[in-house]
Amino acid sequence: MYGYLRETDDSTAINYSAYGKFLPGENTGFQLLTIGAKFLRIFRVNPYVLKEPGEDNEEWQQKTKLECMFSCRLLNKCQSVAVARVPQLPDQDSILMTFDDAKLSIVAVNEKERNMQTISLHAFENEYLRDGFTTYFNPPIVRTDPANRCAASLVYGKHIAILPFHENSKRILSYIIPLKQIDPRLDNVADMVFLEGYYEPTILFLYEPLQTTPGRACVRYDTMCIMGVSVNIVDRQFAVVWQTANLPMDCNSLLSIPKPLGGAVVFGSNTIVYLNQAVPPCGIVLNSCYDGFTKFPLKDMKHLKMTLDCSTSVYMEDGRIAVGSREGDLYLLRLVTSSGGATVKSLEFSKVCDTSIAFTLTVCAPGHLFVGSRLGDSQLLEYTLLKVTKESAKKQRLEQQNPSEIELDEDDIELYGGAIEMQQNDDDEQISESLQFRELDRLLNVGPVKSMCFGRPNYMSNDLIDAKRKDPVFDLVTASGHGKNGALCVHQRSMRPEIITSSLLEGAEQLWAVGRKENESHKYLIVSRVRSTLILELGEELVELEEQLFVTNEPTVAAGELLQGALAVQVTSTCIALVTDGQQMQEVHIDSNFPVVQASIVDPYVAVLTQNGRPLLYELAMEPYVHLREVNVNETSFATFSEQISTQLTSVSIYSDASQIMKKNTVDGRDEKPENAAENGHHVAVPKIKKEIPDDDAMLYGEDDDFLYGDAEEDEPMVAAESGESSTRLQNTRKRKRLGHDAIMSSRGGEQSDAIDPTRTYSSITHWLVVAHDNGRITIHSLPDLELVYQIGRFSNVPELLVDMTVEEEEKEKKAKQTAAQEKEKETEKKKDDAKNEEDQVNSEMKKLCEKVVEAQIVGMGINQAHPVLIAIIDEEVVLYEMFASYNPQPGHLGVAFRKLPHLIGLRTSPYVNIDGKRAPFEMEMEHGKRYTLIHPFERISSINNGVMIGGAVPTLLVYGAWGGMQTHQMTIDGSIKAFTPFNNENVLHGFVYMTQQKSELRIARMHPDFDYDMPYPVKKIEVGKTVHNVRYLMNSDIYAVVSSVPKPSNKIWVVMNDDKQEEIHEKDENFVLPAPPKYTLNLFSSQDWAAVPNTEFEFEDMEAVTAMEDVPLKSESRYGGLDTYLALATVNNYGEEVLVRGRIILCEVIEVVPEPGQPTSNRKIKVLYDKEQKGPVTGLCAINGLLLSGMGQKVFIWQFKDNDLMGISFLDMHYYVYQLHSIRTIALALDARESMSLIRFQEENKAMSIASRDDRKCAQAPMASEFLVDGMHIGFLLSDEHGNITLFSYSPEAPESNGGERLTVKAAINIGTNINAFLRVKGHTSLLDSSSPEERENIEQRMNTIFGSLDGSFGYIRPLTEKSYRRLHFLQTFIGSVTPQIAGLHIKGARSSKPSQPIVNGRNARNLIDGDVVEQYLHLSVYDKTDLARRLGVGRYHILDDLMQLRRMAYYY
């Protein structure tokens, strides 16, 4: 048994976040870093996102959003994160990450290549440091000094590693000190932070020298201590400078307070304490649960009646601290200072707003707070400080107080008047501030995935339903979130457009929607045929245009719009037609003997390419009338350049740049500044003309000097070339300041972002011509002068980084070309009589086709088209490169570079290699002598503002989302498409039109606005508002059964009196936090509106938990030899220690009833058929061969459902606690809480159940989920555990290590760094499979994929492999680590090996599972590296590509 594992979608939860300057460059601003399990993202705050008009307003509004600028995936889960400026990169922040068990990596974004660069690696994994431990290590913690002098990491909880950041050192050298060497009592460290304001780096430890538990609190409490340790990084010396003992025993975390206050805040579950070396401590207690269990002096705030366990906090400013609780509430902790403002005298704690359940809090730009969550959506909040006037505050206080309490006689005022007035002023200051929060943006999270199921495809158009389709079409529904963030998530792997109308157009090849009406809807639909063109007028219906406005007697090559849609342009084989307002304005005949094969239309230019590779350029002129004017290419520098390289052009396209990235370098290599540099949203350095105001004066007077004295400094001499421009900029700056512009920017987060305001850069849009040559070179020319500004050599190699060719490289390439031409002539003369000449010629032509760039376009994607992406088709693959600003030494050229994105789109459906082992012919052959464009950029389709549709056999949508960068979504459900165009109409707002390849059907469609296509897995999230535990789809009723719960505080305890349980109510005071056991309910959800079906709620008893819910097919008496499907539920009643644990088995069915008026979804009801209490806890359920298998504690029972009753057939004693069961035919997998997994076999003829085999590893971790891996006649068993391991077992009684079949044989074990709680099996996707023989296809179809969802929101699959593919990919996995450096320096074998590392006794070679995340890095290598690596493996690169592409497509469902 061999397998292939790959995570297809990255985690959506966020574990860590930080704010800093992570992207290199002078004008990049500050960014937000988020890490979720293994997925790292860097965001910028973009305040210029356009929001479409709503019902209230008719104009577009600007809003603030988080925009992903960089993302990457790690090999292993990150355990802790810190940020620092290291000496190697002083101009940007570096990221320090720790990994299991004691690894530390320092990484940063590389300026030249825009990838994650590893700066320093540190491994502290030593047998001596472990002190004999093999498991249960303390997680590694990393912290950095606020002054960037050093970093510290906790190693195995017993040692501290120090990393000094010496300024003149080229390397970061670390050293380790045992904690016991600092102080013998320093042990059991809970947290540590660096303190600010000390001469030397000082670490504050929170530790517990003598541990205690809540059960021993009556004898030992106040056990927590802190210790401040000064670190001398030069002499490697430690000194204890501060100690405080007898802190409350519930303290668990520290928060360092910056200057001028200093000190630290200690957070506990029930207490908050502020500590400072110079002032007495102060603290508060939050409830009465702690009464009698601490002697630490605490201020009474028990009226809050809350706890802070699992909380997180962050320091904001001015003594304010944001605290997030586990209930999803955000609190404000205020450090109240004395009159001098330097010492803290008390704490104030209050609730400010509701948020997601926070796991991390980070203060971003001024006035912005990021809430990162693992259980709900992460949020970007804006907060503003509200001040209440003293009169209103005093009036409010007078209303609240009793008049008799505030009456003061004359003697009091005469004696204490000043003190009374000061006290009243202090009270006014305390009450006059409050924070108001508002949500700006949220990052969607679909984790944790607790349960998932398949469901009927929702939103499925009738035109897409095909009875002959073999592959299933389904939705994946998951139970996600927790508490108030609980939700149902509906996932659709492929795009399913909503078909509005469909019609047959025989002979149609391409289509375009052009021309705009006043309401922005399209006027015409141009349909190109083989020898003619059909023009359809768009209105309520599609009607053929009778007027002769367009050219109809020739096929159309391209069509588009100029003047923002006012002018429709049609390019045919021989001419160009301009149409506006129902009349043809101009018809330009192209001066060429060869027909036009390609064209690009971008306002105000039209570029065409003829069949002989000659480019022609036209520009729209407005004087003396609107017409197209041809630009004489022969008079530009392009003609000279073409003669020098003497190549034929294969593609031309025009790019309109709105990102402000494409700027020419000046003579010294720097970027040229556009004319409106101060207007474009970048914070460009303005020449300083007015004098700087001293800091003290600025604090006192601010900018009042401008108002009082004007601008006398303006008369100072200026540089003549910039005087007018600079004065204009300064004048504009002054105007904005007077209008409060800075305050507006601060509230929107724009002052620390390099985002561009599109309203200011609209006038500075530049245009460029992208040209592809037949020798694999891509050049970029400026328009309209066609000057060469950038050239990419050897693009056919598809390197990871594209840079501008230097003059030396160009000369070298010319010489190599001349040498190759001479050698070719000699070989031609020698091989005139050789029989292999013809074969060599065929191979040479095939090689030329593989190196040919068929299409190349630069498309502006993302928010405000700020991310230019180079999309090219080469060797029947679509490759993507993202442009970024980079230093270019060549004057007059663009200061940009391109980095390859980890996305590869294959355009073939058949394998690259034939049966004879040779390269198969190209599928992208020219039809009728023409090759139509496959790259279709668009603006505004449904909720997607811009994107690209790739046509062909595998239609793919490209979206550059703000959530995580570039995402690809296939649309293969309707087969291959040969034409696509965006379409806007009164009936179909922001839709699209496409044409199928197979039947030439024209379909007008739109995308579902409810789904979020920014996500890697398109999803629709339905908020439920409570914890969702389980979800199951009932096919017969087309309904979803959902088990959920809400916490319900309880003061009851059950005791046994005379063999009966009785309730005892324990009265507690009103400030006591009562335990809140969950109250479970069962609901039916309809897929019509994704809401609970009215009047179907089934409530369970108090203290009763639902442990399992399954749809079980059981043998039915009503059907001869048939099965009826029922909904089965298992429950456990846990009333405490004294009452025996019982449980129930409930069998019910969903029946159809008459719906209530106005409630169409109320046509379903739950009918309970069986409901009885069992003699033990019912912990698992499944159906096995028409019978019901149930786990009850340490036993397994099998039942037959007959006469609405369960009749016991057989039982089996297991180990400790069986809590999950999975079955297939007559075998089942039983998971035990301590004894891993067992294989159960049921023999129906003997009514006997037995353990066939089990996993008896002593080092086995606690299991979480299991599933079968089906490979035709063979079957394997998958197991996930709490350490993130996935283990593959097989039943091999003939193997000696299986001990005659008693042991399950371990075939593979891998650690993916995330916990898996849900598996599903599904047939492989075979629609795009082009196998060589029916036998091979049958074998492939019998292999099933096992899908998994993790608690971090990621998804993946495991698929069986043939031995031939396994050996090929296994060798690839072994060698690929030497070619591709891994992020953070993680070693492939070390990072992905099972944890904890233990010898495996029941398996010989536990490496039979291929790591798809590693081997798929091969797809993103350059062609040279691919060929070299394949040669080392002894195969061709196309063989490996075929294996990987087939595995990808087998897992890409409808």
Curated annotation (Swiss-Prot):
One of its GO terms (biological process) is mRNA processing. It holds the Pfam family CPSF_A. Residues 810-843 are annotated as: Disordered. Disulfide bonds: none annotated. GO terms for cellular component: mRNA cleavage and polyadenylation specificity factor complex; nucleus. It is found in: Nucleus. Keywords: mRNA processing, Nucleus, RNA-binding. CPSF plays a key role in pre-mRNA 3'-end formation, recognizing the AAUAAA signal sequence and interacting with poly(A)polymerase and other factors to bring about cleavage and poly(A) addition. This subunit is involved in the RNA recognition step of the polyadenylation reaction. Belongs to the CPSF1 family. This is Probable cleavage and polyadenylation specificity factor subunit 1. It comes from Caenorhabditis briggsae.
